[in-house]
């Protein structure tokens, strides 16, 4: 068996009001999810922003490489169109807006 163990999502921006932006909560658009009740499956799932940096970092049990990850968790639905809110260990950088986020299919709640 091969293939992805994660769903594709796009980082759409930060949670915000009309004038204030709250960077501690990210808004994600998950591919194939278009209604609020479809987001139920993804609540509590881990998500990851994978990116490459300039310098190598040591990875546990592997060679040093340029790949880095910011981990987060999907917390709740946002609106009625299948968007979700996620909190990351450190806030996502603004340059990540419009880029891919991996939504892992664990932990399972079924």
Swiss-Prot record:
Modified residues (N6-succinyllysine): 63
GO molecular function, one term: structural constituent of ribosome
Keyword Ribonucleoprotein: yes
Keyword vocabulary terms for this entry: Acetylation, Cytoplasm, Ribonucleoprotein, Ribosomal protein, RNA-binding, tRNA-binding
Domain of life: Eukaryota
Keyword field contains Ribosomal protein: yes
GO cellular component: cytosolic large ribosomal subunit
Subcellular location: Cytoplasm
GO biological process, one term: ribosomal large subunit biogenesis
Residues found modified as N6-acetyllysine: 8, 63
The protein's assembly and partners: Component of the large ribosomal subunit.
Family the entry assigns: Belongs to the eukaryotic ribosomal protein eL33 family.
Protein task: Component of the large ribosomal subunit. The ribosome is a large ribonucleoprotein complex responsible for the synthesis of proteins in the cell. Required for the proliferation and viability of hematopoietic cells.
Designated name of the protein: Large ribosomal subunit protein eL33
Originating organism: Bos taurus (Bovine)
The encoding gene: RPL35A
């Amino acid at each position: 068996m091969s293939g992805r163990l994660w769903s594709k999502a796009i980082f759409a921006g930060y949670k915000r009001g009309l004038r204030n932006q709250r960077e501690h909560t990210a808004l994600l658009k998950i591919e194939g999810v278009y209604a609020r009740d479809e987001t139920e499956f993804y609540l509590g799932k881990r998500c990851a922003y994978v990116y490459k940096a300039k310098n190598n970092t040591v990875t546990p049990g592997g060679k040093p490489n340029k790949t880095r990850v910011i981990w987060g968790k999907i917390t709740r639905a946002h609106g009625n169109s299948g968007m979700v809110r996620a909190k990351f260990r450190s806030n996502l950088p603004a340059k990540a807006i419009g880029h891919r986020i991996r939504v892992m299919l664990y932990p399972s709640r079924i």
